[in-house]
């Protein structure tokens, strides 16, 4: 492991070559529809986080129905700004790697753990993490993990919100790392059943694989956060 990401991939599935070929040749129309479903699920979970903490989200909720094929109207970016301002305050600005802001450091660290969980599940199904649906970045060796983690980011946000809620001061330290590591056991609803997040991720990723292989499975089994 390096920075919570696997250095090597092991593929236990004997049909991996066939699966990866189908993954590499996925039609753009299917990719566009998958991405629409993924972004709708992300915004839905963000809304559940807001509602779960008593934050008025009526304006935010409308974004769920506005997501289009391939998110070609950019609803994800619009909704993200409002979401973070509602959750962490109007002055909060999301920053990526290199930030010195503790809250952003918390988020980035939590997301890196989540991404590693997703990557492990992806390789376990025989899919290849380098073949993304939406993300394509020469510096990202696992764009598929970056894609599939999107609906699960609110699980990290929720844990961090609860962690800082009643603290006047918080630091990136061992206590926080031990706390956020429990992301894998967070309560989740998938296929109308309660699961821990770790199990739900495997169900979710397997459903993506089935869509890629069969090309006629009508929906993704998407995890829903349970506050």
Regions found by a protein language model. Name each.
Residues 5-9, 14-227:
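Active-site helix-to-loop segments that bind/position phosphate- or nucleotide-bearing substrates
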Residues 1-3:
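Short, acidic/turn-prone active-site loops that include or flank metal/cofactor-
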